[in-house]
């Protein structure tokens, strides 16, 4: 599946409607620069700033993740969110993990990593996928680790009321190239098929005996 860039880190600055990033000037844009050399330097500075922000966010992620001694550590999942409304963006920690996995796999210097990004080289994924937030009301049921079908509860009680469970699911796209098999496979010699794969996440569920509890359930996570 294609990797998405994590959003920039927002910081407070003076001025109306201003959104700034560490080390980046908040006034002017690339169109107002004096010449092509300045534009090139501006783009390079922006790329360096982006990578610097990502590294800061990754460091913060390690700090906020629950430790092994925490009794609630097994409830941690990047694809599950408790919220009063539908999340507008993919989960930040999920994006950071994908970016970190890419950097670890690349095992290259920062500048080489940036220029080797598949998105920069115009590469395409083998299978096209789509990702979206799904509510428990839409899922209704799921399969747990024991193979039993359980009911996914729509709301989770919290001290100040209730929050809805949302799941960030990724599955193969029903449109386009996926119907013709995997991209890049020679169809003269090989048959291929894009399939949605699943992973386990922790969710509040109820079994057929009306017992409510946190269980690992399967959701669509990749193509």
Curated annotation (Swiss-Prot):
One of its GO terms (molecular function) is growth factor activity. The keyword Membrane does not apply. Disulfide bonds join 127-194, 172-223. Residues 1-5 form the signal peptide. Pfam families: NGF (PF00243). Its main location: secreted. Keywords: Cleavage on pair of basic residues, Disulfide bond, Glycoprotein, Growth factor, Secreted, Signal. One of its GO terms (cellular component) is dendrite. Gene3D superfamilies: Cystine-knot cytokines. It is found in: Secreted. SMART domains: NGF. Glycans are attached at residue 107. Promotes the survival of neuronal populations that are all located either in the central nervous system or directly connected to it. Belongs to the NGF-beta family. This is Neurotrophic factor BDNF precursor form. It comes from Eryx jayakari (Arabian sand boa). The gene is BDNF.
